[in-house]
From Swiss-Prot:
UniProt-listed GO biological process terms: cellular response to heat; protein quality control for misfolded or incompletely synthesized proteins
Species per Swiss-Prot/TrEMBL record: Endomicrobium trichonymphae
One Pfam family named in its UniProt record: LON_substr_bdg
Protein name: Lon protease
UniProt domain Lon proteolytic: residue ranges: 603-784
This protein's UniProt keywords: ATP-binding, Cytoplasm, Hydrolase, Nucleotide-binding, Protease, Serine protease, Stress response
EC number: 3.4.21.53
Amino acid sequence: MSELDRFSNDKNEMPKIPDVLPLLPVRDIILYPAMVLPLAVGREKSIKALEESMSTNRLVFIVTQKNIQIEDPTPKDVYNIGTICEVLQMLKMPDGTLKALVEGISRAQWTDFKLSDKGYIEVGLKVFDENTLKMPEVEAIMRQTIALFEQYVKLNPRIPIDISVSVSNIADPARLADTIASHLVIKNNDKQTILELVDPVKRLEKIIQILNAEIEILNIERRIQNRVRNQIEKTQKEYYLTEQMKAIQKELKQKDEAQKDLDDLKGKLKKTKMPQAAKSAADKEMSRLEKMMPMSPEATVIRTYLEWILDLPWEKSTIDNLDLNRAKEVLDQDHYGLEKVKDRVLEYLAVLSRVQKIKGPILCFIGPPGVGKTSIAKSVARSLGRNFVRISMGGVKDEAEIRGHRRTYIGSMPGKIIQSIKKAGSNNPVFILDEIDKIGSDWRGDPSSALLEVLDPEQNYTFNDHYLDVDFDLSNVMFITTANTLNNIPVTLFDRLELIRFSSYTDVEKRHIAEDFIVPKQLKEHGLKPEEFIFDDGALDIVIKNYTHEAGVRNLTREIANLCRKVVKGLEFNKELKSITIKPENLNKYLGIAYYERERIAENDVGVATGLAWTEVGGETLTIEVNKMGGKNSLVLTGKLGDVMKESAQAALTYVRSSSQKLKIDENMFSNTDFHVHVPEGAVPKDGPSAGIALATALASVCMNKPIKKKIAMTGEVTLRGRVLSIGGLKEKVLAAYREGITMILFPESNKKDLVDIPEDVIKKLQMIPVSHMDEVISLTIERLPENKNIKMDKRNGENGI
């Protein structure tokens, strides 16, 4: 609109046009006088032409290319007649291109085409005079042109209606012709033809010819569109009526089906036994449902809610198997060892057989991965004759996953607890909450806090799910939780759990588990008969010792499965073979080179001690290296040690310094010596105080320049005065040392009570030496001190005690 308004006002002055101007070739654009147009300029010569124009008289000659594909046009590639334009604005872009706003001034024909010294094309010009006498004939042609253009605008939806108003106000025939031509939706060849007509009257006659042709075409298009529209409307009308009839029939049928569904829900509600509160809530929702249209969104929400309430096992329980002998038999069939777990289940059954009603225990199985925590829970369910459900709590961060979403939310549903109860089909299943030490929390709530109500026997008989909004009794459920470590379990949740610890398996236990459970199961899964797959004496022990290094039996299961696959392949390739025997000498053929070497190097070394650590994946041995060098009495600690372990190292160094006279260490050495303590496997975080005596021993060894016996491992916290304090996880640490070929273990005397948990077959092969002071540790690992005459040994195992 603003552009056309500008066209309608004549300029008071015409800029003086020189004989030579910079040439700006454009693509796919025909520019007429009095026409304002934005241009994007990117070619080098065109950019230089514009810059030259802006630095002189702001005039440039714009002509259209015949072929838009040509990058560097020659005289034969452009039309002879173009438009002299004034550059109104120019803007440099960050990518080096230009944006310009130009206005056409006059038609002209180029006469000379050459490259200037500044790198742009310049042309000589012949400017045309377009003055026309005011005659009645010219006025008639102008009126006819305006009338045809108004008709054209009405037929062409791509041109705004208000254009015709602006055009009707133009009095100059040349200006009128150019304005109408610029708005015609025609080919560029036709637009160029109009541009080349210098006489305004001839130009208007050409435009009248084009408008008549275009109007005829537009009328034909409109008739075709009307005919097609009428046909479509007829088809759509028939389709609409057909669909409406189908909808009416479907509605009548749906009403029958909806009524049938409603009757089914009513009948189910009458038959289902549930607490009075749940019954009242269901009746209330049923009354609301009866008053609603069957297909309304709210009706669907209520129907889903009622289905959830009616499907829950409110008073449906399985009958417990109270035969203790049968229960023990089932537990022994599925698992080797794990006596504490089995005893706890049998105790529960024994009490249940007397009192009939007992609150379900909340057990927590703590132990390394792969030791049977989840699988024993399944066996517990089987021994009790109960249904079994399991949900994994690892990574759960939303409280709504426990308590459910309120019904105000779209797509809401009960939490995992109620969902699992429905899945179990009884209100007294064995319910395992796996990996509760890996529960997260964020802005959506704290799931561990939501579990407090679930796992508290004093509260869970009125567990309220947000979706149901009625209490459900969970007191009959036997909850079993599992975790690898207690560190990440909140104190309030931990207080509600009855702990049962699972320890690492010994090699003997692993062999029994493999022979009785893993091998038969893998043979069945791989389609092998027992006579086709034979383990020779000692082969299974080598697999356990040299191909696995774990607390549980998961890797052992994988290695046995690997052997089964190799045996199946061998039997299938060689049909004559009846069986394959796995022997110690051919294990490398099937499993490759042994991954682990149990026997440690027997060479003693200065400043290298073996500590023992307990992690969530079981016990581990910990090599501690200490070196000294000239310096200023500083202690460097590396190996990704935690704050507690760093403080333990500092305490150990203080003890060694304070005992320098007793240990025969030069006291002056500490003032000019730096100590570097390193624990290998630097990428693995390490923390805890139980490496204190190992750190002190390694530091003393370096200061005394005497080696430490390599077959000794030790664990215990050390004080500044050398006392050895108790630690946790002794069984796991001892089993780890046993796996690594350690023969002597020093442990705090206050931990002697924990020896009863260590298997007899392990104790018999180890020297377990309780210590209460660092003097005893150093005398056993480096050399005996004359003043220390009472070294204590465990007398539990005859000749193995010292």
